A protein has these predicted regions:
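Intrinsically disordered, low-complexity, basic-enriched segments
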Residues: 2-73
Length: 73
């Protein structure tokens, strides 16, 4: 099921993105810039491997990731 813009992301997506964000912070990087770079390019090399963040971000719905990033500005 595709998410329409403006819909609230699922709890599992939010939890996954929170875990990814924590892993990026733990590695000493800015979660916003790494997730934004991934979202804009689709290149997973923007995201650290720490805590399996790189593997996990590939599984997140891009609409959920965009929604999360809009809320963190």
């Amino acid at each position: 099921m595709r998410q329409k813009e403006g819909e609230i992301m699922t709890k599992s997506s939010k939890n996954a993105i929170d875990r990814i964000s924590k892993s990026i912070r733990d590695a000493g990087y800015d979660p916003y810039s790494q997730m934004y770079g991934f979202l804009m390019t689709g290149n997973d090399r923007f995201v650290t491997r720490t805590g399996q963040a790189r593997e996990r971000i590939k599984l997140v719905n891009p609409a959920d990731l965009a929604s999360y990033l809009r809320r963190t500005i």
